Amino acid sequence: MPLVTTKDMFAKAYEGGYAIGAFNVNNMETIQGIVEAGKKQQAPLILQVSKGARNYANPLYLKKLVEAAVEDSGLPIALHLDHGDSYELCKSAIDDGFTSVMIDASSLPFADNIKVTSEVVKYAHDHGVVVEAELGKLAGVEDEVNVSDENACYTDPGQVEEFVSKTGVDSLAIAIGTSHGAYKFKGEPKLRFDILEEVSKRLPKFPIVLHGASSVIPEYVDIINQYGGTMPGAK
């Protein structure tokens, strides 16, 4: 079984009414642990690699490790670039054989976010790769992504339809109050489920991604599943 795209996964998740966990990896031991858990649950997996992990471990090594995980487990596994901060980085990941990439241009003005995301989408789709983008900014420190609580902002549901339509993106990460990296365990997250609900109404059956899920309580994960969300790292 080859690596799969997240697009295939999300379609099946909607049919089955479940979310999919995405887990950051940077070495063999981490990949083995995640895959063993996946085998026990017979769950599809998104194994994602950050910019820092690519610099640390070499994307070729990581790709071969993930391919070995597919061969060993027989599970549907996607290899995803997490928080790609430029067209060049996303292009490099696509050329390296990643089946999914995230372009995070959420720090840019809305129009510029659309422009950069559209460029990535064109190159990715030409190569059979799917794209995740982000609207709104999550608080947190992860690799070179650093957004303070003061600069974090919720996603504006009024922008999501235009953004998806103009970019052709395959999934959308939104900000509803989760945080990632060094901020993720600083108190119980105050999640704006009203934003999640409104986005799901405006984008019916469209894959929604929530980052920073490690500290989200199980009851909240159940609610997020109801709205078709995927939660990287969800417990």
Q: For the regions a protein language model found, what residue spans apply to each?
A:
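Conserved residues at beta->alpha junctions
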Residues: 24-25, 212
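Short acidic/histidine-rich active-site segments
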Residues: 212-215, 234-235
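Terminal accessory/targeting
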Residues: 5, 14-22
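Alpha/beta enzyme core
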Residues: 4-12, 27-53, 60-76, 84-207, ...
